[in-house]
Amino acid sequence: MTALPAHLERVHMVGIGGAGMSGIARILLSRGGLVSGSDAKESRGVLALRARGAQVRIGHDADALDLLPGGPTVVVTTHAAIPKDNPELVEAARRGIPVILRPAVLASLMQGNRTFLVSGTHGKTSTTSMLVVALQHCGFDPSFAVGGELNEAGTNAHHGSGDVFVAEADESDGSLLQYDPNVIVVTNIEADHLDYFGSVEAYVKVFDDFVDKLRPGGLLIACLDDPGSADLAKRIVASGRSDIRVLGYGSADAQEVEAGTAFEPVDGVEVGVRLLGFHAHDVGGVLQFQLAGENAARTVRMAVPGRHMALNALAALLAARDAGAETEEIVEGLAGFGGVHRRFQFTGRERGVRVFDDYAHHPTEVRAVLGAAADLVRPEDDSSSTNSAAGRVIVVFQPHLYSRTAAFAVEFAQALDLADEVVVLDVYGAREEPMPGVSGALVAQSVTKPVHYQPDLSQAPKQVAALAHPGDIVITMGAGDVTMLGKQILDALRSAPHPAPR
């Protein structure tokens, strides 16, 4: 067992049930640390941590700092979700107990490992999870910390026996600059978290600064299909830094491969792998790709849908190869990847209607998920089939954060127009106070497809069941409690009268 730094031997975590915080707690417990924490409500994550020995209190008060014998050596929190006047943070300051952010703990836990960090505006959790599953299939036992629960492992974090540590690097508050990785994957870059950064330029710059943290001999893997990450790769190459490598991945067609141009450097950026095609199949898809230096394409059937997921898989492939894994075994591992909790997760099927759940809460994520859903009801290779003609995409969208809804209301509406029918719920405010004039109606009013604004969450399942017909796909979407509706929609479908033919 790897010894913990002295300051992490007794840790109190404010908001311990969150995806990122609970993962850190798991690793600390696995490495022999004592952990206490608090959270606003009971959850599956809290129950799992208690079962592993953590002392967790529901609600926040100063006495929570006495859950561990002798009190904590440090208090850990997150930048955005926990207010500064939280009584535990106030008490920690009174006692002189250091308060640090979650990324600082993760950086300490990574010391002595080869670190593989996945960053980008979207796709971090899925790509990180694919890399973990691929490495595990290849016989590695990596430590990992992921922002979602891997369906195969049933957990979001693990203390491994090997020297590889895989994690996603969250850019939302700039704290990813605390890491000094060996490998960085950047899936995409576009405006987000402007409430923190203040400008698009400042947001983009944090990725440049992050790449500057690469250790000598390190590797940047960047998606060339995305303008933001492609521009980052080109800037790094143009900067002349000679102690790191830059490797791109992205789409190409068969003609480019046959002409020998697919693997030519893009403004100096070396190309490692090309996606040649992706076709939807049931709840997954088949992707075709070719690696640089190989003369033939490879094909892999995946259990997760969407072209964006195919690109994520190629990023994971390049990273796993850099870790020393064999290509054939990596591909087998990716074929067995069953997805991540709340990332286009299959909830169930009732009366011919497939129900999925997704965490998408940014317009680009919404577009990617709805595009993948459209492929499932209207497959590229069977666009004339009866099934394809009948199937529709119905999205139940819950906007996340008042500030994000106000900033991107029109963009959300444009993305939601990729669905055939839209149900918009009210805003899930999370840490934010309501803003005048900002509600789900602000998004719904700009949707041009058939749209229903439903401010009452409890009424949504019956409403959706009445809209859905056999062959349709329903997606519950958002970063809030919309995820609870999936099972309720299936129940409503089960008990609803048989729908009349369209």
Curated annotation (Swiss-Prot):
Gene3D superfamilies: Mur ligase, C-terminal domain (3.90.190.20), Mur-like, catalytic domain (3.40.1190.10), NAD(P)-binding Rossmann-like Domain (3.40.50.720). Its main location: cytoplasm. The keyword NADP does not apply. Its EC number is 6.3.2.8. It catalyses: UDP-N-acetyl-alpha-D-muramate + L-alanine + ATP = UDP-N-acetyl-alpha-D-muramoyl-L-alanine + ADP + phosphate + H(+). The gene is murC. GO terms for cellular component: cytoplasm. The keyword Nucleotide-binding applies. This is UDP-N-acetylmuramate--L-alanine ligase. Belongs to the MurCDEF family. It comes from Rhodococcus erythropolis (strain PR4 / NBRC 100887). It is found in: Cytoplasm.
